[in-house]
Every structure is written in C-alpha cells, then in structure tokens.
Amino acid sequence: MKIDALDIYWVKLPLAFNFRTSYGDQLYTETMLVRMESAGQYAWGESCPPYVPSYSAEHTTGTFHTLRALMAPRIIGQEIASAQDLLDRLAFIKGNQFARAALEITWWVLDAKRRGLPLHRALGGSRDRVAVGADFGVQDSLDMLMEKIQGAVDAGFPRIKLKFRPGWDLSMVEAVRSTFPDFTFHIDCNAAYTPADTELFRKLDRYRLAMIEQPLADDVMSLINHADLQKRIETPVCLDESALSLAHVQAAIRLGSCKVVNIKMARVGGLTASRDIQALCAEHGIPCWIGGMLESAIGGAICAELATLPNFTYPGDIFPSSYFYKNDIGKPEIVLSGRGEVATSRVPGIAQEPDADLLKQWTVEHASFRV
C-alpha cells in the first residue's frame, strides 16, 4: 500500500497516581501516537518509549526526532508491500527500536483494517480474549500493598507482579507470601541489582515465585551475568530490558540466560519481531508474556491482539484504562471483559483511536507528512 499521509504526535499523559519502581517515581508518561493513511483509510498505532533514558538508551525526545527527521521521510509516498518491506527501508538506522516500532506497528494495524481483519487475525492469533495480570509498584506501607493485592485477587486477576528494589525486597516478598501462600506472584527488579546480589536471589527460591524479571543490570555483560545467575538459582529468570531484539533473544537462549521472556512490542522493534521472538522461544520451550510501557488504550489494545499468539502463555501487562489513567486518551477505553481478561478486537484493525480534544491538549509536538 502507498503511504499517503503520516502524522506523529509526541504526547504527555498524566498518570492517576505516583508509580514507583527502581527507576524512580513517575507521575506521567510520554508516548508516540501515529496516524497512517492509505487510499482513504487510516489507522492509529502507538510506541511508548521512556521519557528519560533510564529503562533504555532511547527516550521520547530522541524517538520523536528520529521519526520526524529520518524515518518518516523514508516511507511517505512509498508503496510498502509488507511490514518487512517497511523494516528494510529503515534498516540503515541502528537501534532506535521504539521509533522503528511506531511506524511498523501502525502499518500492521492499517494493513489489517484494509484487509477487513481484526489485528490479531492478521498476526496469526485466534483468541477472542486474553488473560491479564495486576501490577503493583513500591507502596507507602506493607498494609497498603496487602490491601491492593487482596483487591486484585478478589477481582479475579490470575497473577500479580510486584516491583522489587533495594529497601522493598526480601521482607516484602516474605510478607506477601505469608499472607497469600498459594497465589501466583513474580517480582520485577528493573535491572536494579548486580551479580554481587546472587545470595539475595537464592533466598527468594523458598517463596516459589513464578519468575524474577530482569534482576541484573542491562549492560554489555547482561546476558552472561543472567546466565550465571540462572545456574545458581531455581526460580526462573525472565529477561525484559536485555531482550532488545530477536538477535538478543537468540543469544540469551544459546547462553542459558533465562527461562522466560517478556516481550514489549516497542522495545523489540515492532510486531514482526515480537511474533518472531515468541515463535523462537516456543521452539526452545521458553514461555513468553506481554510487557507494558504504560501505553494508552491504543497501545494496550494492540498488546492484547499480540497476546493471542500461541506462546504468550503467562498473563500479560495489559491494564484496564482506569488503572493508570483518570482519563485515557485512547477511546474506547480498555475494560475487563471477565475476571482477569481483556477482549480482543471484533472490528478490522483495532477499535481504539485518540480523543481529539485530549490529543490537542496533551500534544507536546506534532509532525505531519503528506504526499
């Protein structure tokens, strides 16, 4: 299809509460919303890089610049035959996975819409709903955490992720497991630890966690260090920040760096890479699950479509809009369709697009391209 029009919006979205992780406190998130048009039809996509280069080297300022100055000019007015064709045209740019994903994801949504298929069908998925989990950041007290966990259990969420950082670590897990002895939990360290902390992770084995997500720093030694750690502990290691691409996951499998992989569609460069990674992991008996970057309902809906692929077997980080946002820019908002479940699209592409008034109010910068 020929790309007739392209609009890129850098948007700042206020969160409903202060979200606390090992990276610090977060009161808002920033994201890239992309509108792509071909032959009178259009679709929206989303890629949500961090707004500071903490989670990754890429961040919103650089992502927007790369999209506006380098990537969008390469595809506007061009006949793009496939998602791989689009990726090939952008291959001259190293890294910048969030920027690459912004265009590739939107291409997938538009192509599905033009073909009259819900996005999950275009990707090869088949489920009409997917299981989702609940996540809790660092809380002001253990009592507050227990109250929130009980609410999530009562609401039917099948698993809970707990943020884990120095000062909110072993004693927190011990208290949670004591109160909820049989529920499925895992922890997310957000790369806050080093190999010197191996004994801490060995102590966690007794608490029967589903996994430890990204325990060690994402640096040049990351895959080797995680492989060494996995040999020394029983709890499965899950890679997040270190699983940057299909090639990174191939290396992780060869080294034995993990037993689980978290796939964030934008972090790995889009839906094509996400699909390929989950297929590769399936070949090696490694389960996958969908991670989130605090996307709006637009990105969240796309994540739900991706989660229908067969090797996404652990409930994903796909949240009802009301969890992180008082007013989600994406409409219709994401809601639970059952106990711990989100429905997938019943219309071509996805149903979500931004509210026009909120888009105008919250846009930081906008770049527009026309043939």
Regions found by a protein language model. Give the residues of each.
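A generic structural signal for well-ordered alpha-helical segments
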Residues: D111-A112, Q230, C281, A307
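Glycine-rich beta-alpha junction loops
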Residues: S38, P49, R267, L294-S296, ...
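Structural signal for conserved beta-strand scaffold positions within catalytic alpha/beta enzyme cores
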Residues: A134, N262, D317-P320
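N-terminal capping/lid subdomain adjacent to the active-site entrance of alpha/beta enzymes
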Residues: K2-H186, N190-P195, E199, K203-R206, ...
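Catalytic core of soluble alpha/beta enzymes
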Residues: L162, G167-G299, D328
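Active-site pocket-lining/capping segments in soluble small-molecule metabolic enzymes
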Residues: S296-I334, V347-G349
